[in-house]
Regions:
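A short, well-ordered alpha-helix in the C-terminal region of glycosyltransferases
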Residues: 335-349
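Membrane-proximal helix-turn-helix segments that form the acceptor-binding/catalytic region
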Residues: 124-145, 157
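Carbohydrate-associated surface elements
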Residues: 149, 169
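Acidic anion/phosphate-binding donor-loop and adjacent secondary structure
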Residues: 36, 170-187, 202, 370
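Nucleotide-sugar-dependent
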Residues: 201, 256-261, 268-287, 297-305
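Conserved acidic donor-binding segment of nucleotide-sugar-dependent glycosyltransferases
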Residues: 312-320, 328-333
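N-terminal subdomain of nucleotide-sugar transferases
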Residues: 1-48, 142, 213, 376
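Nucleotide-activated donor-binding/catalytic signature segment of Leloir-type glycosyltransferases, i.e.
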Residues: 232-259, 267
């Protein structure tokens, strides 16, 4: 198929370091690798990561009316039979273009965007935002979501909309090549977090748990890689616990450098805070698994499914249980090895090729048969 993939969110720059940017690059490249002709249209090209290997990349203009015209021109110029859009608060231009040209639109939904914006970003017109969202979903041909919680959410907003759950993926070759080394020449056990520093990621709680663990485990070290709005509070938590000499705060790391960071670790943590609607399918967790790292995680949302038998789970927001899981892995090299091997095996189910195949199935379901030529 000829596919147009659209991302109108300026906060997700194509070459950016955060997970959303990595997802845009990797799913678009995976669809191209599957045999489709993929045009990628994004609002921002900024960042330091390399562009994905797709047929063509276009930067969208700012005014939404101009974007709709630009999207329509791209559909016509490249004979696109379907549009896949990463749903955002700024969505709408692709819907207008698709309606005018009678081309099916499939939304890729990675979060309940309107509710998230009201909760964390000060969105004031909640009811208007939800009404607009419902209109966009009802006009779409289908939706692809990354978690079961999101499937429930989208189906509640638009009951007639076909919804497929497709978890995020991981570049198996890149991360498995950088599996943890056992020949570092020291006995330090490195516990790591790699990802955006956002309030709901719970990195401050990880620092608190590490502080308790460090009192009785002199061999442990904490490695934190990432940037975001919570970075200042994370640094403050480290200073308050007098842990500056035992915590490495690396700041923002390019995505192509993440495997090398993971290769220095012995175990990894996804310390999410409890929420009523945990909708994440974290790239970081899948990358931890592919790198052969045991994962410590809260038993919430789809995380038990994503981690499988490759980690230790604890009740969300239970700091003592988090400390216990960390301590158990720190003190048992055999357990770390067994869970690490299970992690690599389990990660094979989440390669981007499989993700692209599942997304393709949804796209093919909404495209007339005569338009589906070219898909592998």
């Amino acid at each position: 198929m000829n596919i147009l993939y659209v991302c109108t969110d300026k906060g997700i720059p194509l070459r950016g370091a955060k997970g959303a940017s990595a997802h845009v690059r990797q799913i678009s490249a995976a669809l191209q690798a599957k045999g489709h002709d993929l045009t990628l249209a994004v609002r921002s090209m900024s960042g330091a990561n390399p562009d994905p290997a797709v047929a063509r990349i276009v930067e969208l203009s700012a005014p939404q009316h101009d974007q709709a015209t630009q999207v329509a021109d791209l559909i016509n110029a490249h004979k696109c039979s379907v549009v896949l859009e990463r749903y955002a608060l700024t969505s709408g231009s692709a819907a207008a273009a698709c309606a005018a040209l009678h081309v099916p639109l499939v939304y890729e939904v990675n979060a309940p965007i309107v509710l998230e914006a009201a909760r964390y970003r000060g969105l004031e017109e909640l009811e208007a935002g939800l009404a607009r969202e419902q209109g966009l979903f009802n006009a779409a041909a289908a939706a692809v979501v990354v978690s079961s919680a999101l499937s429930h959410y989208v189906s509640t907003v638009a009951p007639a909309l076909p919804v497929a759950v497709v978890s995020n993926g991981v570049d198996l070759a890149r991360f498995t090549r950088c599996m943890p080394r056992t020949d570092r020449g020291d006995r330090t056990i490195r516990i790591g977090f790699v990802g955006s520093m956002k309030p709901w990621h719970g990195v401050e709680e990880l620092v608190t748990a590490f502080a308790e663990l460090a009192l009785r485990e002199p061999s442990v070290r904490l490695v934190l890689a990432g940037h975001g709005p919570s970075l200042a509070s994370v640094r403050a938590a480290v200073d308050l616990a007098h842990l500056a000499d035992r915590v490495d705060i690396l700041g923002e790391v390019r995505h192509d450098q993440v495997p090398s960071v993971l290769a220095t670790l012995d175990l990894a943590v996804a310390p999410y805070r409890a929420t009523e609607d945990f909708y994440f399918s974290p790239l970081k967790v899948l990358e931890y698994l592919a790198a052969g790292l045991p994962v410590v995680y809260p038993k919430i949302g789809d995380l038990p499914f994503l981690v499988g038998q490759a980690g230790l789970g604890y009740p969300p927001d239970d700091g003592s249980a988090l400390v216990a899981c960390l301590g158990r892995l720190v003190g048992d090299a055999g357990l770390r090895a067994r869970l690490g091997a299970a992690a690599v095996e389990h990660a094979q189910s989440f390669g981007w090729a499989g993700v692209a195949a599942r997304v393709t199935a949804t796209l093919e379901n909404v495209v007339p048969v005569r338009s589906c030529g070219g898909a592998a």
